[in-house]
A protein has these predicted regions:
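Sec-dependent N-terminal signal peptides
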Residues: 1-15
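Repetitive, compositionally biased segments used for assembly/scaffolding
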Residues: 18-109
Length: 109
């Protein structure tokens, strides 16, 4: 029984969820993000979900948490594209989310 509880506790830690927190200072961030104007300019198309259980792996479904310690990734929104690690575009529908440039996928693991 003890081992089952340990395994059940560790399984959520190994999933690649996309709970993000928008940080105030760039030096505290894991990833610097720039929001582009057009979909064809982005590396990742992001859909903001309403609940944390709606995130599904590294597929561009982001849930913005209220506290830094709840997040999987801390992101900082930059003012210029050349300052960013990742360029994103917010989409209107869940099925539109996903990676356009898979070479940047490692940034969100």
């Amino acid at each position: 029984m003890k081992y089952i509880l340990i395994i059940l506790f560790l399984i959520p830690l190994t999933s690649y969820s996309q709970k993000v927190f928008s940080i105030k200072y760039s030096n505290q961030s894991d990833v610097k993000v720039y929001v582009v104007e057009y979909e064809n300019q982005c590396d990742l198309k992001v859909f903001k979900v309403d609940y944390p259980n709606q995130v599904d792996g590294n597929k561009g479904l982001w849930y913005f948490v209220d506290y830094q310690n709840q997040s999987d990734k801390k992101i900082y929104f930059v003012d210029y594209p050349n300052q960013s690690d990742l360029k994103i575009f917010f989409v209107k529908y869940k099925n539109q989310s996903g990676w356009r440039d898979k070479s940047k996928q490692h940034l969100m693991y």
